[in-house]
Curated annotation (Swiss-Prot):
NCBIfam families: aroQ, PRK05395.1-1, PRK05395.1-2, PRK05395.1-3, PRK05395.1-4. Is involved in the catabolism of quinate. Allows the utilization of quinate as carbon source via the beta-ketoadipate pathway. Signal peptide: none annotated. Keywords: Lyase, Quinate metabolism. InterPro entries: DHquinase_II, DHquinase_II_CS, DHquinase_II_sf. This is Catabolic 3-dehydroquinase. The record marks 26 as: Transition state stabilizer. Substrate binds at residues 83, 89, 96, 110-111, 120. The active site is at residues 31, 109. Gene3D superfamilies: Dehydroquinase, class II (3.40.50.9100). Pathway: Aromatic compound metabolism; 3,4-dihydroxybenzoate biosynthesis; 3,4-dihydroxybenzoate from 3-dehydroquinate: step 1/2.
Amino acid sequence: MTTNAAPTKRSILLINGPNLNLLGTREPEKYGSETLSDIEENARRQCNELGFDFEGFQSNHEGVIVDRIHAARTDGTTAIIINAGAYTHTSVAIRDALTGVRVPFIEVHISNIHAREPFRHHSYLSDVAQGVIVGLGTLGYTAAIWSVVEKLKQGGFS
């Protein structure tokens, strides 16, 4: 029996939180010289080469990030990669949104949050994330995309 069903679309959503819109000019000694646009363009290219759609999203507002995570539940998002910025250390709301939508996610940080100020050492996301990548600079985004694709090839996240 032949079906005409469309293939399932695979899509990666990259969420960046507060102040990450300033990448390239904000503390380049910690975050490097790449802009958010550079990161998103590299991620889009990598996703497309691997057969995935890509959406980049950035907001400085916690509720807007929560709303975008909620939308991922029904918009075809296969996986989320999130750098929640400072909200990593403060936002139970973002944690609850991520666990509530049941879309697998990987937490990424450009700098090593464990080698910085003590208040940055705790993440509200790490213990519910499928993976955490810190301290690799913007290469962490590339590693996260590769990890998502490889996990899905192996049958998905458990």
